[in-house]
A protein has these predicted regions:
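Glycine-rich portal/gate segments that line the openings of hydrophobic small-molecule binding cavities
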Residues: 208, 227-228, 237-286, 300, ...
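A conserved amphipathic terminal alpha-helix motif
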Residues: 306-352
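Intrinsically disordered, glycine/charged-rich C-terminal tails and inter-domain linkers
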Residues: 139-215
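Residue-level recognition of strand-loop junctions within catalytic nucleotide-signaling folds
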Residues: 58-60, 255, 306
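Beta-strand elements of well-folded, non-transmembrane domains
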Residues: 12, 37, 110, 211, ...
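Hydrophobic ligand-binding cavity/cleft-lining segments
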Residues: 192-241, 352
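Catalytic NTP-binding/metal-coordinating core of nucleotidyl cyclase/transferase enzymes
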Residues: 1-71
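Catalytic beta-strand-to-alpha-helix segment of the class III nucleotidyl cyclase homology domain
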Residues: 61-168
Length: 352
């Protein structure tokens, strides 16, 4: 079989494991490796897991593979950032997670597969080449190193960005060049945490609920309770960084092939939470809820919602989206208030 052989390798793995607490470093690395694997899902076949690296293959050889790897790189650093934001643990593993990095090795060649004790192994001279390339002379920690063979189907616009980095091994000389991924990393880490400013929000509102901020926050974030007040058949919860809410997703299933995904961008329990979702006409919608006690048995929630509409139809889009969001919001707010008024009964229903 011929195609691209791809190695995704976490940089700084050995130092991270050696210098940090074993339990937390193991959990963090498992989360990162799982994130890389999920990003590759359905696009690159993961043939081998090699500690801090994944050996992958694909019959695709075009520039689309590079686009996939850039996307995976962004998701990797987005997860690192979420872990750093979410954790309050002072251990070295949690405090130095931003020192980890990711690099890719890409080579085009022939390979075959065989099994040992039920585990797939890759075989072939080109498999040896891509593994040798993990040890190279590239003067960076994060990059995409591609052989000349891998680049043959890529456009000149991309090849022109690569810097030559020929390598020599026992398997012979390998013509290769690398792409610096540091600008992508910097863009992720420097991207401001989106919170909706009430002054620029397209929808602003205040609702008062019976109960404490902790109770209200729980009703907003507990998937089983969200299922009840949204009135949908199912809400699947995907945990965020280190099991937190930051980066978490709520997959709200409305019916066959109908799903709305709410992603938590920022959270400071029980006082504030920012989510984003895809909404008809508007595209991405952002919502920030600011939660504050108002007396011993009442909680005030100030909500700010924003989206971006462009073009000549923007006023009409704004009108339609605002109308729909206010309609849904009124229904949901009423249900949450009713549920909070009889919390024991609703908690029992949610646990069924």
């Amino acid at each position: 079989m011929e195609g691209l052989l791809v190695m995704a390798d976490i940089s700084g793995y050995t130092k991270f494991v050696a210098g940090t607490e074993a339990e937390h470093s193991r959990e963090i690395l498992a989360e990162l490796m799982d994130g890389i694997a999920k990003s590759f899902g359905g696009r690159l076949a993961i043939d081998q897991v090699e500690g801090d690296a994944l050996a992958c293959t694909t019959e695709r050889t075009d520039v689309g593979v590079v686009d996939w790897l850039r996307e995976t790189f962004r998701l990797f650093h987005g997860r690192l950032r979420d872990i750093r934001t979410a954790t309050t643990c002072p251990c070295r593993a949690c405090a130095t997670v931003q020192d980890l990095g990711l690099k890719f090795i890409v080579h085009r060649g022939e390979f075959s597969r065989y099994e040992v004790a039920g585990r797939v192994q890759l075989h072939g001279n080109d498999v040896n080449v891509v593994h040798r390339l993990l040890k190279n002379t590239v003067p960076l920690r994060e990059y995409l190193l591609a052989t000349a063979a891998a680049q043959t189907s890529w456009p000149e616009s991309l090849r022109g960005q690569l810097k030559a980095a020929p390598q020599t091994y026992d398997v012979g000389a390998v013509d290769a060049a690398y792409l610096d991924l540091r600008p992508v990393r910097d863009s992720v880490w420097n991207e401001p945490r989106p919170k909706v400013d009430p002054a620029s929000a397209k929808i602003r509102g205040t609702v008062r609920y019976p109960g404490t901020p902790e109770q209200v926050f729980r009703y907003f974030t507990d998937a089983s309770l969200r299922k009840l007040w949204m009135g949908v058949p199912c809400v699947d919860f995907v945990p965020g960084a280190r099991g937190s809410l930051v980066g978490a997703e709520y997959h709200c299933i409305h019916g066959e092939n109908q799903k709305t995904v709410f992603k938590v961008l920022d959270s400071s329990a029980p006082n504030e939470i920012t989510m984003q979702m895809d909404f008809p006409l508007a595209g991405t919608v952002w919502r920030t809820d600011r939660i504050e006690a108002e007396g011993p048995a009442t909680t005030r929630v100030d909500t700010a919602i924003a989206w971006q509409a462009h073009g000549i139809k923007a006023p009409l889009v704004d009108f339609m989206v605002r109308r729909m969001l206010l309609k849904y919001g009124a229904v949901y707010n009423k249900r949450v208030a009713e549920m909070l008024a009889v919390p024991d009964q609703e908690t029992a229903r949610a646990s069924v």
